[in-house]
Amino acid sequence: MALTAFTSREGGYSAPPYSSLNLGMHVGDDPSVVARNRALVDEMYGPVAYMNQSHSDVVVEVDHATNVDADAMITRTPVVVLAVQIADCIPLLLEGESSVAAVHVGRRGLLNGITDKTLNLMAEENVVAYLGPSICGRCYEVGADVFEEVVAQFPLAASTTETGALALDLPGALSAHLTLRGVAVVRDPRCTVEDATLFSYRRDGVTGRQAGLISL
């Protein structure tokens, strides 16, 4: 069985507004402090491979701890832990019998098909998907143009905020899509905006990044 974990913002060294277990090197935090935070994660879970994420559909296969330009990683070796960094997007972890993957799924990732691309490259018959904490359908308010673009392709993404504004339920849409593909889904119900123990770009603007982690 694969190792899976989702970090929070607690237990690290970073000062506000990145306090404290910020794992993102690209958010303005002191790189030396982020390195200390990443070392803590290495000590707990093993050597970690990270991605420079850009909402692309790039999937890379890795066999050692590295840093790659991609939005999904696959490995077929147990010697590396895969990390996906988020602060509202969905950290999607995929567990197969002989491979695992970490996928960054935001609105653009949902539309560009990076999840299907990763599943196809894994080429596994039995896959379990773990969806970590992300922004929920009550909090992800969007404009009409964005709403219509996403809902045209994923009708189950349609949602509203508590005030009735248009919103998107990305984890709900992704869960339904995975289920249709025959993938078993395990979903963490926490919302990054609503849970103060998690980083949220939508809530805070300048902030850190937590991670979803998976290894064979």
Segments predicted by a language model, with ranges:
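Active-site microenvironment for binding and transforming phosphate-containing groups
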Residues: 1-216
